[in-house]
A protein has these predicted regions:
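Long, contiguous hydrophobic alpha-helical segments, chiefly transmembrane helices and signal peptides
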Residues: 12, 20-24, 28, 84, ...
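Short, charged/polar, low-complexity loop and linker segments
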Residues: 6-22, 37-45
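Amphipathic alpha-helices that form helix-helix packing interfaces
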Residues: 28, 35-38, 42, 51, ...
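Short, solvent-exposed segments of well-ordered alpha helices
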Residues: 15-33, 49-52, 56, 111-122, ...
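Extended, compositionally biased non-globular segments
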Residues: 127-248
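Single conserved hydrophobic/aromatic residue that forms the stacking wall/gate
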Residues: 1-3, 250-261
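Extended amphipathic alpha-helical segments with heptad-repeat/coiled-coil character used for oligomerization
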Residues: 52-145
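Generic hydrophobic alpha-helical segments
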Residues: 41-42, 135, 206, 259
Length: 261
C-alpha cells in the first residue's frame, strides 16, 4: 500500500494535508493483520520456540508501524492541521464549545453528545496493551475512564474481540509475565522488553505530534476526542514505563539454556 495512491471516500476540507493525515492512519493499519496473527500464534504456542517466534512476529509488526508513523511529518504539515481539525472535534468533552450538546435535525429533538475522531479508538495499541500486560498498570483515574469511554465507539465485534483477548491474558496462567517466569524463558523476556519499547516509541511519537500539531497551533486544551491534551498521553506513557520497570526487576535463574532459542 502506498499513501500517495490512497484517496478518501469522504472528506471535509479536501486539502492534501487532510488526506495525508487520515490516509496515513489507514496506511499504518496495513500491518494490523500481522499484529493480530502474532497474538493468536502466541495463544496457540505450546513450546518455548513457538512463543518466542510469535513475540518476534509481533515485534516486527510494531517496528513497521512505527516506521510508517514517522511519515506523518511529511504527509500532513502541522501548520495546516487546524484547517480540518475543526471538522473532527467531538461534542462530548468539549462543553465550552457545544454546551448542552447538538440536535441532529431529522434524527432527534434531544441534544446528543458524541466524542470526536481520535487515535484512541484504533485497535493497534489497545491490543498491544492487553497482550503485553500494560493494561494491568493503567492508572485508576479519570484519564483511564476517558480511554475506556472512547473505546466504546468501536464496532461491537471489535469490542467483543478485545474483551475476549483481555479475559484470556488476565487469567494468571495465560499472562505473558507468568509464562516467562514459569518457563524461565529469558529470550521471551528480552523480546517482550523490545516490544514494550516499540509501544513506548509509538506513544511518545504521538505525544510529539500532539505538541507540534495541536499545542503549538491552538490555546484550546482539548483533543478531538474531548480529552485533556496536556495530561492524556503522558498518563498512558507512564503505564508503559511502569510495565517495563516491572519486567526489568524479574530475576530468572539459569537463563543461559534458553538464550539461543
Amino acid at each position: 500500500m502506498c499513501i500517495r495512491d490512497s484517496a478518501m471516500a469522504a472528506k471535509f476540507s479536501g486539502m492534501d494535508d487532510e488526506r495525508g493525515f487520515i490516509m496515513l492512519h489507514v496506511d499504518i493499519n496495513q500491518h494490523s493483520p500481522e499484529l493480530v496473527g502474532s497474538v493468536f500464534d502466541f495463544i496457540e504456542s505450546k513450546e518455548t520456540k513457538g512463543v518466542n517466534n510469535s513475540l518476534r512476529k509481533c515485534l516486527s509488526a510494531m517496528k513497521k508501524i512505527n516506521e510508517r508513523r514517522q511519515i506523518m511529518w511529511q504527509a500532513s504539515r502541522w501548520k495546516h492541521y487546524n484547517d480540518f481539525r475543526v471538522f473532527i472535534m467531538g461534542i462530548k468533552g468539549n462543553d465550552e464549545i457545544f454546551g448542552d450538546g447538538v440536535v441532529y435535525e431529522g434524527v432527534s429533538e434531544e441534544p446528543k453528545k458524541y466524542r470526536g475522531q481520535t487515535g484512541a479508538q484504533d485497535n493497534i495499541i489497545p491490543l498491544m496493551d492487553i497482550f503485553s500486560g500494560i493494561i494491568n498498570n493503567y492508572p485508576k483515574n479519570e484519564l483511564t475512564h476517558y480511554l475506556k469511554d472512547l473505546r466504546s465507539y468501536r464496532p461491537k465485534c471489535i469490542q467483543n474481540f478485545l474483551e475476549d483477548v483481555r479475559l484470556f491474558f488476565t487469567t494468571s496462567n495465560n499472562s505473558i509475565l507468568n509464562q516467562i517466569k514459569a518457563n524461565k524463558n529469558f529470550r521471551s523476556l528480552e523480546i517482550l522488553l523490545e516490544l514494550l519499547e516499540e509501544i513506548y516509541l509509538f506513544r511518545n511519537g504521538h505525544w510529539q505530534f500532539v505538541q507540534r500539531y495541536i499545542m503549538q497551533n491552538t490555546l484550546y486544551p482539548k483533543a478531538t476526542g474531548g480529552t485533556p491534551i496536556i495530561s492524556w498521553i503522558p498518563n498512558q506513557i507512564n503505564a508503559v514505563l511502569k510495565t517495563m520497570q516491572e519486567l526489568s526487576l524479574i530475576h530468572i535463574s539459569e537463563p543461559t539454556r534458553l538464550l539461543s532459542i
